[in-house]
């Protein structure tokens, strides 16, 4: 089975419902025009999921709708949290889990992330497990150890046959303008695939898509597309502008 290609936009805490609808009114036609090989998705804020779901349906778009996080329980006394059944009301296809901002700002731990990965997979929502090393780990030469641990612990609750997507985002490259070289990214992605083969099997590791994120822009997207183990992109700031995101998508699919 051939690995699928994905280009996802993570909007973080940006865009009101109106702004999201305005974005999609411009971006969806771009996607139809480009007709990319990659599956395209956006992960907006929870408060705009309804508007995005409505717009995607109205425009008969193939764009996937994602969420930026989720609680592992289906309901309960968890103030401020959102459950998988709530996301499924808006036909959410994927959910980002373990993003570095959740790990480092909100102190999410691997064990909790693993529960979320398992819950999402069992609910039919594709978990996108985000992994990445800090600048300190990179400078100390412990990148592979950090990533290996994040993969093994984060995937501990994933059902054996469930789909999963991995997103490698070096923390030192997120929103900093610093971009890892294509050679470095390819080396890390190949290593991650090797770890996945140990966790699951060689066969399963070959069908798991691994995305790259970290200051991805239109002018570097084509370079990442040439890396054999880079199966897509997780785009931050560059996904907030419809033309800019379309350019990333176009260049990655040249």
Swiss-Prot record:
Keywords: Cytoplasm, Gluconeogenesis, Glycolysis, Isomerase. Involved in the gluconeogenesis. Catalyzes stereospecifically the conversion of dihydroxyacetone phosphate (DHAP) to D-glyceraldehyde-3-phosphate (G3P). Belongs to the triosephosphate isomerase family. CDD domains: TIM (cd00311). The active site is at residues 99, 169. It is found in: Cytoplasm. InterPro entries: Aldolase_TIM, TIM_sf, TrioseP_Isoase_bac/euk, Triosephosphate_isomerase, Triosephosphate_isomerase_AS. NCBIfam families: tim. GO terms for molecular function: triose-phosphate isomerase activity. Pathway: Carbohydrate biosynthesis; gluconeogenesis; Carbohydrate degradation; glycolysis; D-glyceraldehyde 3-phosphate from glycerone phosphate: step 1/1. GO terms for biological process: gluconeogenesis; glyceraldehyde-3-phosphate biosynthetic process; glycerol catabolic process; glycolytic process. Its EC number is 5.3.1.1. Homodimer. GO terms for cellular component: cytosol. This is Triosephosphate isomerase. Substrate binds at residues 10-12, 175, 215, 236-237. It catalyses: D-glyceraldehyde 3-phosphate = dihydroxyacetone phosphate. It is an enzyme of class 5 (isomerase).
